[in-house]
Swiss-Prot record:
Mn(2+) 2 binds at residues 80, 108. It is found in: Host cytoplasm; Host nucleus. Belongs to the influenza viruses PA family. This is Polymerase acidic protein. It comes from Influenza A virus (strain A/Brevig Mission/1/1918 H1N1).
Length: 716
């Protein structure tokens, strides 16, 4: 790698990178990937600034060659690449002359045209994740962030990319070339995997002074210093030590081991109460899409442009009215919010140029729906510790809910095939090893089985919505931004298609911690009449907003079109996981792989081809009251994927607890089926731990009912 860096980069850049590594006490012979990363970052900073000048009229211009005597000033001041002292001197001087706020961390550039510092990032990972890490580290709205990736993606604060398209394309092309060059020398994989997240200030925080003395004083006996204790903890092997202690204790441990027989286990007790309601962040089987095929309009790919184009495909709008009110909400406000969206979209269409983003007017209905000014005022604890009756809020116990049939229907629907493909077959280069060949063959077979699955649509929809909401939450903290809910797919004929499910309006989003909540209002199109299963839609206000003509066996029929509106909320950490929903594909592929591996080890040859191509064979899919359900290998793939996707969509503490505790009972039952004569103690306590997670969550209740079917059939 070191040789490659010296060949690939300008000697001046290499020299600066060597200096930087020396300054931080790093050895470039060992940290070769870091050496390459520093050179790449330096080169991007220089390319960013190259050819950009400000003329005597204060206009930003691009000059690649020309009159050396022209009165031109460099548009960007380069801070990156200078030694720390010099760099801070430059920053201080800029702050003094321009009045800019002094940044906490050294930025990379200063833009004299926009009067702002710029932090440049080059990442081998997802641009969104790296952007968030940068934003979390800098914690300043004044410093502009611009991230490039080696795959040609980029992300910048408020989607303001500073430079013209051509200058940015030069940078992306260079990064792509570096990647290709590395790959051809077999260096890329190691380089890609070596990227660490942004170091937070804590990692480099040396404990000194009083805190250090306190740390040294609070060590367990027999440890002289914090370093000693750390070294001991890092090298501690717990097992032998704990076993020794347990054998000394066994006289005092009073656990009677009871045999676990077929008659021992009882079914789980599911709660009684009103039926459970829908709690996903967006509609699933009930969603309706307004779509455009082969999009080629101006601004294609910009969400707002796409949304307006999709809205224009529908002509059946009518005066909206509430058909299913939200019991606790102010329903006229939801109605007004939808009317406001329609009116503001109409305003945009009347403008000459459609903007890239749309911030909604802060009307009373939106303030109410987004909970503006509703949070109780925070008071410093020191100011109120003398208050005699200081106590936490009384929070009500959650109301118990019973299992409703709709969640099983949702799951069945998620396993079905749609008539569109939601993921592309990844184009990866030629396989160079037999194991790679088998892996890519498995991936291709699996992709073919799940690419049209509705659960895959939910993945892409979830990734899009969470990415868009997280971007808007970082870039437009104070604005009520309108975010279209969009997905993209290909039709059977291979034509591209852009779909609009509805809109989200984001509330204020000053998200400092991972768990800070951003409120949003979702408005989603549907043809489902909410009056058929009102319990499912408890959290929604549903409007009737139009009539849609549908083709049917008897010709065209008109069906009312509904809008499902609700207030909801999410957090940075939930959005981060939402953005990574593609992992569900990987998880289910790994489960299928373990089935293939088991089959292959019995037959002593790779069974991938036979596994996917033998259409006559059926495989167990799951338990139902009727017994073990079986289906084709494709159905198994789609069912496993749907389970993984629902675990993500309905993630909750109840699910975490139920999964962890029910697994223990499952292992005991499996041991009994394998004639291993298992014994248990405190089985009642285990049932209690499982059943305390069965409260009101639809997905957990469905899993518990499946678990009961499994118990019934497993112990016959």
């Amino acid at each position: 790698m070191e040789d490659f860096v010296r060949q690939c980069f300008n000697p001046m850049i290499v020299e600066l990178a060597e200096k930087a590594m020396k300054e931080y006490g790093e050895d470039l012979k060992i940290e070769t990937n870091k050496f390459a990363a520093i050179c790449t970052h330096l080169e991007v900073c220089f390319m960013y600034s190259d050819f950009h000048f400000i003329n005597e009229r204060g206009e930003s211009i691009i000059v690649e060659s020309g009159d050396p005597n022209a009165l031109l000033k460099h548009r960007f001041e380069i801070i990156e690449g200078r030694d720390r002292t010099m760099a801070w001197t430059v920053v201080n001087s800029i702050c003094n002359t321009t009045g800019a706020e002094k940044p906490k961390f050294l930025p990379d550039l200063y833009d004299y045209k926009e009067n702002r510092f710029i932090e440049i990032g080059v990442t081998r990972r997802e641009v969104h994740i790296y952007y968030l890490e940068k934003a979390n580290k800098i914690k300043s709205e004044k410093t502009h962030i611009h991230i490039f990736s080696f795959t040609g993606e980029e992300m910048a604060t408020r989607a303001d990319y500073t430079l013209d398209e051509e200058s940015r394309a030069r940078i992306k092309t260079r990064l792509f070339t570096i990647r290709q060059e590395m790959a051809s020398r077999g260096l890329w994989d190691s380089f890609r995997q070596s990227e660490r997240g942004e170091e937070t200030i804590e990692e480099r925080f040396e404990i000194t002074g009083t805190m250090r003395r306190l740390a040294d004083q609070s060590l367990p006996p027999n440890f002289s210093s914090l370093e000693n204790f750390r070294a001991y903890v890092d090298g501690f092997e717990p097992n032998g030590y704990i076993e020794g202690k347990l054998s000394q204790m066994s006289k005092e441990v009073n656990a009677r081991i009871e045999p676990f027989l077929k008659t021992t286990p009882r079914p789980l007790r599911l709660p009684d109460g009103p039926p459970c309601s829908q709690r996903s962040k967006f509609l699933l089987m009930d969603a309706l899409k307004l779509s455009i095929e082969d999009p080629s309009h101006e601004g294609e790919g910009i969400p707002l442009y796409d949304a307006i184009k999709c809205m224009r495909t529908f002509f059946g709008w009518k005066e909206p009215n509430v058909v299913k009110p939200h019991e606790k909400g102010i329903n006229p406000n939801y109605l007004l919010a939808w009317k406001q969206v329609l009116a503001e979209l109409q305003d945009i269409e009347n403008e000459e140029k459609i903007p890239k983003t749309k911030n909604m007017k802060k009307t009373s209905q939106l303030k109410w729906a987004l909970g503006e000014n509703m949070a109780p005022e925070k008071v410093d604890f020191d100011d109120c510790k003398d208050v005699s009756d200081l106590k936490q809020y009384d929070s009500d116990e959650p109301e118990l809910r019973s299992l409703a049939s709709w969640i099983q229907s949702e799951f069945n629907k998620a396993c079905e095939l749609t008539d569109s493909s939601w993921i592309e077959l990844d184009e990866i280069g030629e396989d160079v090893a037999p194991i790679e060949h088998i892996a890519s063959m498995r991936r291709n077979y699996f992709t073919a089985e799940v690419s049209h699955c509705r659960a895959t649509e939910y993945i892409m929809k979830g990734v899009y919505i969470n990415t868009a909401l997280l971007n808007a939450s970082c870039a437009a903290m104070d604005d009520f931004q309108l975010i279209p809910m969009i997905s993209k797919c290909r039709t059977k004929e291979g034509r591209r298609k852009t779909n609009l499910y509805g809109f989200i309006i984001k509330g204020r989003s000053h998200l400092r911690n991972d768990t800070d909540v951003v409120n949003f209002v979702s408005m989603e199109f549907s043809l489902t009449d909410p009056r058929l299963e009102p319990h499912k839609w408890e959290k929604y206000c549903v409007l009737e907003i139009g009539d849609m003509l549908l083709r049917s066996a008897i010709g065209q029929v008109s069906r009312p079109m509904f809008l499902y509106v609700r207030t909801n909320g999410t957090s940075k950490i939930k959005m981060k996981w939402g953005m990574e929903m593609r992992r569900c594909l990987l998880q289910s592929l790994q489960q299928i792989e373990s089935m293939i591996e088991a089959e292959s080890s019995v037959k002593e040859k790779d069974m991938t081809k036979e596994f996917f191509e033998n259409k006559s064979e059926t495989w167990p899919i799951g338990e139902s009251p009727k017994g073990v359900e079986e289906g084709s290998i494709g159905k198994v793939c789609r069912t496993l994927l749907a389970k993984s996707v629902f675990n993500s969509l309905y993630a909750s503490p109840q699910l975490e607890g139920f999964s962890a505790e029910s697994r223990k009972l499952l292992l005991i039952v499996q041991a009994l089926r394998d004639n291993l004569e298992p014994g248990t103690f405190d089985l009642g306590g285990l049932y209690e731990a499982i059943e305390e997670c069965l409260i009101n969550d639809p997905w957990v209740l469905l899993n518990a009912s499946w678990f009961n079917s499994f118990l019934t059939h497993a112990l016959r």
